[in-house]
């Protein structure tokens, strides 16, 4: 059944090949093309290599009609079905067979060395593929013969999964995770934002407050005008050191007191006239 499903594929086609009758081999040494009548081939035609499954077929056909002249099945290469001669790379010896099982050895040759190279490589590639297929099939059979590992659950078997602080098991419920006291933190202000400083409270004293210096008073309570007039007097007026003024006195109160006392003082026209 498998052979019926296999299809035939063409591996190589060469339009010009010569066929020679070869003398029987007298010893174990290889065939020599110089023993053949190379200038008088017994048949010329076309060579075609096909494959069906693992077997390759060398077919000698007529150039015009394509009628089959001879066929050589090849099950192994290199092997007895195809041999190379010892004195040339363009000639080979193949074993042909007919439908009745009879076989014979004939010589074939190519006029071009490149055609002989393609003939040789086509057979090598085919049997290399056959070898790889055999190894793959053997490995697959070994895999099938090995005991399979049963990873399934047995009857009534359960499992327990632990994910972080949440424990889940059959028939149970998961407990919600409580947030810790130090879990939350304030986010920093966005870039470019302004930080507003709150104003100080009324209960906080201002440390940089400066107490204004006291203003000395004259012994007779004169005004600012009197002080200017006294600059031209011949003898300076010495006044005793004023009593220290407390920080609670208002600076503007002293000025108002001096201004209010100006009308009560008598002007000194003599000193102003001399100036």
From Swiss-Prot:
Keyword annotations? Cell membrane, Cytoplasmic vesicle, Endocytosis, Membrane, Phosphoprotein, Protein transport, Repeat, Transport
Q: What superkingdom does the record give?
A: Eukaryota
Residues with the modification Phosphothreonine, per the entry, are 211
Protein name in the entry: Adaptin ear-binding coat-associated protein 1
Name the gene: NECAP1
> Which locations, inside or outside the cell, does it occupy?
Cytoplasmic vesicle, Clathrin-coated vesicle membrane; Cell membrane
Residues covered by region (Disordered): 166-190, 215-275
- The species this protein was found in: Bos taurus (Bovine)
UniProt cross-references to CDD domains, sorted A to Z = PHear_NECAP
Q: Which InterPro entries match?
A: NECAP_PHear (IPR012466), PH-like_dom_sf (IPR011993)
Q: Which GO terms describe its biological process?
A: endocytosis; protein transport; vesicle-mediated transport
Its job: Involved in endocytosis.
The keyword Cell membrane appears for this protein: yes
* One term under GO cellular component: plasma membrane
Subunit composition and interactions: Interacts with AP1G1 and AP2A1 components of the adapter protein complexes AP-1 and AP-2. Interacts with the GAE domain proteins GGA1, GGA2 and GGA3.
């Amino acid at each position: 059944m498998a052979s019926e499903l296999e299809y035939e594929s063409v591996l190589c086609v060469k339009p010009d090949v010569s066929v020679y009758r070869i003398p029987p081999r007298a010893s174990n040494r290889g065939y020599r093309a110089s023993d053949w009548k190379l200038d008088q081939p017994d048949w010329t035609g076309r060579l075609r290599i096909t494959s069906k499954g693992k077997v390759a077929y060398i077919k000698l056909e007529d150039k015009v009609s394509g009628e089959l002249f001879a066929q050589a099945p090849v099950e192994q290469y290199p092997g007895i079905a195809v041999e190379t001669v010892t004195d040339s790379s363009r000639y080979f010896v193949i074993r042909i067979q007919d439908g009745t099982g009879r076989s014979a050895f004939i010589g074939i040759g190519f006029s071009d060395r490149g055609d002989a190279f393609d003939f040789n490589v086509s057979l090598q590639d085919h049997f290399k593929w056959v070898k790889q297929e055999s190894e793959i099939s053997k490995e697959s059979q070994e895999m099938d013969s090995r005991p399979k590992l049963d990873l399934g659950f047995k009857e009534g078997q359960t499992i327990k999964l632990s994910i972080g602080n949440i424990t889940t098991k059959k028939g149970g419920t998961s407990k919600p995770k409580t947030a810790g006291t130090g879990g939350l933190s304030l986010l920093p202000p966005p870039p470019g934002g302004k930080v507003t400083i709150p104003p100080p409270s009324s209960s906080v004293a201002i440390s940089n407050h400066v107490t204004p210096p006291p203003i000395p008073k004259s012994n007779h309570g004169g005004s600012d005008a009197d002080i200017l007039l006294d600059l031209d007097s011949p003898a300076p007026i010495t006044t005793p050191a004023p009593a220290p003024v407390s920080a609670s006195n208002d600076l503007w109160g002293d000025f108002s007191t001096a201004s209010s006392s100006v009308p009560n003082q008598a002007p000194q026209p003599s000193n102003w006239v001399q100036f």
